[in-house]
Amino acid sequence: MPRKGPAPKRPVVADPVYGSPVVSQLVNKILLDGKKGLAERIVYDALEGVSSKSGNDAVATLKKALDNIRPTLEVRSRRVGGSTYQVPVEVKPHRANTLALRWLTSYAKGRREKTMTERLANEILDASNGLGAAVKRREDTHKMAESNKAFAHYRW
């Protein structure tokens, strides 16, 4: 454990094309094996596809999709007297954003379209319309928190 306290959060650098830190974070989530150029090409092509299909600004559509995916509650395991309870807790904004990006990319990878660009574009469009697997994941997370509301007094 560090003696100087927690490491400070580094600021997210905005990406050069759209000037948005959210797009930069999405590129870093898509990134595999250090191939950042490939990840950028996938994200930028997907955002172009989003803007051509929806007719709206791509970054605005992405932010709307992330708002629809971002969870407000989640459950965390808490051990009390030999039994483990799933305790609902509020999600901090930074973690909510991270979870939204993680779910968006993971469910885009699991889609059936031919290229990753198409998968990501269609998942962003579905999420912005309140559909898709990533939005369903948020609903399931909220449902778990709702069903375990009885254990909310174990919060820490």
UniProtKB/Swiss-Prot annotation:
Keyword Ubl conjugation: no
MF-aspect GO terms: rRNA binding; structural constituent of ribosome; tRNA binding
Entry GO CC: small ribosomal subunit
Keywords of the record: Ribonucleoprotein, Ribosomal protein, RNA-binding, rRNA-binding, tRNA-binding
GO BP term (any one): translation
PROSITE patterns xrefs: RIBOSOMAL_S7 (PS00052)
NCBIfam families membership: rpsG_bact
HAMAP family associated with the record: Ribosomal_uS7_B (MF_00480_B)
Family from the record: Belongs to the universal ribosomal protein uS7 family.
Name listed for the protein in its UniProt record: Small ribosomal subunit protein uS7
Originating organism: Leifsonia xyli subsp. xyli (strain CTCB07)
Taxonomic lineage of the native organism: Bacteria, Bacillati, Actinomycetota, Actinomycetes, Micrococcales
Gene: rpsG
